[in-house]
Amino acid sequence: GEAVEFPRKDGTPFAVKTQPRPVSKEVEAWVTTAGNPETWREAGRAGANVLTHLLGQSIAEVEGKVKLYRKALAEAGHDPSRFKVTLMLHTYLAADRETAREVAREPMKSYLRSAAGLIKQYAWAFPAFKKPQGMTNPMDIDLGSLAPDELEAILDFAFLRYFDDSGLFGTVEDAVKRVEELKAIDIDEVACLIDYGIPTAVVLEGLKPVAEVLRLTNSGSGADETMAGLMFTVEGEPEEL
């Protein structure tokens, strides 16, 4: 927990401390999984928390994996109620859904562009995509063979699907609905991913509706529902919703 010095651009030292301060006798551990069911089981057997996301897996698929995880915890002698499943979601909220969509569109398309495997899956589901004759596996798609306008159309399709199904996007009302949906499948925390290319000032302004979602969905939970509490957690660890 002691400060560690790192050099600034000009070479002068800058002391960095971890936040929040380590006060627990034991440090909690999270296993990160992209969706492999066996990883969920291993995390349960090891008595670790889980961090996952919706890139390449649906909410329904995550629900099944959470059940596998809780079962593995119990079979290994752990109390399942003491362990957390944290779901990371790309996040941006605004006063109306259209504004949120347009602010997030290009940054999310750039983010998705870097995930070749995911783009191949979306291309496979894109109605206008002409699958090469004899190809049965989307991972066999050669993205380099796509014309620029074809790739752009697939990215637009991928973004709209992701915006609607796999993130914390839209209005406060949209986000509350999504969080309640996640609570119903036994998700303990939502980690709001906000630094994926949206300008900093816009991101910070967008924390205000996120704080309102926090207030509405954590009512009575004892969590810090103030903006100060939200800002602290965003700078430190994933926020609970």
Where are the language model's segments positioned?
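Structural motif
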Residues: 46, 185-187
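Glycine- and acidic
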Residues: 48-52, 160-165, 191-197
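An alpha-helical appendage that flanks or caps ligand/catalytic pockets
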Residues: 1-19, 60-184, 220-240
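C-terminal helical cap(s) of enzyme catalytic domains, especially alpha/beta-barrels
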Residues: 62-70, 199-220
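A conserved active-site cap/scaffold subdomain adjacent to cofactor or substrate pockets
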Residues: 35-59, 65-66
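A local structural motif
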Residues: 22-28
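Glycine-rich, proline-tolerant flexible connector loops at the mouths of alpha/beta enzymes
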Residues: 54-59, 192-204
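Hydrophobic faces of well-ordered beta-strands that scaffold small-molecule active sites
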Residues: 29-32, 50-53, 83-90, 190-192
